[in-house]
Amino acid sequence: ARIIQLYSKLTIIQTTLKKKITAIEENDWTLLVKMPAFSVLAFALSEWRQQGSRLLSDKEEALLANLRVDGFNGWSAHYDTLVSFIKIPFEEADGTLNELSAGQAMNRMYADPDPSVRRKIFVEWEKAWGYLAPAFADTLNHLQGFRLADFEAHQDEDFLVEPLRYNRIKRETLDTMWQAISANKQPFLSFLDRKAALMGKDRLAWYDVDAPVSLGSFQSKTFSFDEAVDYIIEHFASFGPKLADFSLDAVKNRWVEAENRSGKRPGGYCEDYPESKESRIFMTFTGSASDMSTLAHELGHAFHSHVMRDLPDLNTRYAMNVAETASTFAETIISAATVREASSDEEKISLLN
């Protein structure tokens, strides 16, 4: 909460600066951004100048920033709290009854080779999330309600105006991307049909979409955390020593929180800290090849921040559409290596899945 409050204060200061930049005459601005002290920041400052033209009064922008602490950010934190209380009961084969966190349950539901296990977890997963459905619905509605009120205050008639600006793309670009996806989705649909056939089903259930495919005597491999790290470092080194050395240091310095324990939300996450020039990674590692890919993915995020560590802060800000490039590339290094080293067609099919 303290960090969010500090960020709110920073936003208010930045808003004032953006408006002052916008007020500078065009000729003076052209001369200013050519000065050595500002030329390196010309792109970021020019972007701020454009943003300043759509801002409200200082008082109104300050009010929005302060309301965001217990409004937009508050509801987001509320969602995280709700997820931390999710418990998925599951009876193991030996009769032991465990309570899985949302993160543990999701990993097992997607990665367990036994379809009966996946189905049992899915049923309990639906019950657990369904029990809190009204609270989640309220959370999502209030998050979106705050966002729409913000857009209306700034006279953004289309809800995509702000996301497009943030991601630095045009509406035509987004539309073209979706058109390309729609026009080329058939191979993906054919893949899902083929996967269902290989699993002996007419169609895939939700918990089968990401499930492993085990053909013949092949069973999906599992890895300890150390084995996954060793594999990742080895194949990162094939791309370049800087990526490998950085990733090894990140693990040795305990930047990765991957413990398989209760109370954790699903998925992986990486956060960078510009003051210390370090990153921290959050995930739940349960030993699957998918978990190894997630670890590689998050290390890719951390390396992205690392290579920009000496740039001015304003030049290190990028949106999600750029953020996923380094991480996806790092993940692909590992995925390609596992497929390349597969010892049988059955293993290769499992990995390609």
Label every PLM stretch briefly:
Residues 1-219:
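A well-structured
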Residues 156-161, 204-208, 268-278, 298-309, ...:
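Active-site-adjacent bridging/hinge elements
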Residues 218-223, 256-278:
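Catalytic zinc-binding patch centered on the HExxH motif and its immediate surroundings
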Residues 219-227, 238, 274-296:
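Short pre-active-site segment immediately N-terminal to the catalytic Zn-binding motif
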Residues 234, 238-245, 271, 301-312, ...:
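Conserved helix-loop functional segments at active or binding sites
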Residues 314-326:
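Active-site metal-coordination segments of metallo-dependent hydrolases
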